Amino acid sequence: MSAATASVGKAYALKFISGKYQGGEYPLKMERQVIIGRSSDLDMVLVEDMVSRKHAKITLTGGKITIEDLGSTNGTFVNGEKVKQARLKEGDRILIGTSILKLVHQGDHAAEMDDQQVRQRLEEAAAVHAAKSPKSSSMAGKIEEVPLPDLLQLLNTSKKNGVLVVKNVEEGRIYLRQGRVYYAVIDDNHALGPRKSFNRIVTWEAGDFELRPAEPQEFMVELEAPTEVLLMEGMRLLDEFKRIQNELPPLNSVLMLSMPMTSPLRELSADELDILQLAHNYGSLKGVLDHSEKEDVAAAEIVLGLLKRDFVRAG
């Protein structure tokens, strides 16, 4: 058995990282089947429209953990892929309806609970979650538990509609139509543009997410690229930005024209002159990135060049 595959010598559980039971865990017992669905007589009951009466089955037997879709209407997804049957490994994320469950290791000394205790613990988790977020949607959680690229892939494959609201210091909104991202905005700053907003939001590594119902809102400009392409481009730009990040001043630090400016302006290209003007007009790296027509990485690289050649200085 490969190291990546769940070993039945360990104790495992399904941890709810979104949905009604967010924060709760369902222990998995060896040589047992767990039937998941909407019907009240099943092992794990998920009462919601997108879950079939008998939706999926998880089996722990013969040295492996597997999941099987039971002919559900809306499908069963593992790590963003719709599956009929799949072998699970630790860390896998399962999407059923609006619940995301993660296969986790419980530890060698996990307390043994009977079925009634398990259900009681889940209901306690549901009560805590409801008390914290009484008005929240059924699909909500923390980015630390499910990174945004993974979440967007799940939503894309399962063709979800709605608005994914992501909050850390800022609030980002990603609009979905049949799972496809068609618009994004940060703090209602539509001037930033949907592509730049999306590329920034997907890099956030901490905060809360919530999938809200679709809004009857139209936008002048929509994103046309497939979600997979948007995600690949966003991750590429993130890698490039991290490469130069340590050389850049903090986003909100002051940028000012060098006084005296010893190098002649004629040495600068048209793009460099544009960025120099933005630095003069808005006075910070964030101001430059927000107002430049270029992607953040390209604009930041030009700022870095201007700093090194002493056309601008960071205060």
Per-range role (PLM):
Residues 1-74, 78-315:
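Acidic, Ser/Thr/Pro-enriched low-complexity segments and adjacent helix/loop capping patches
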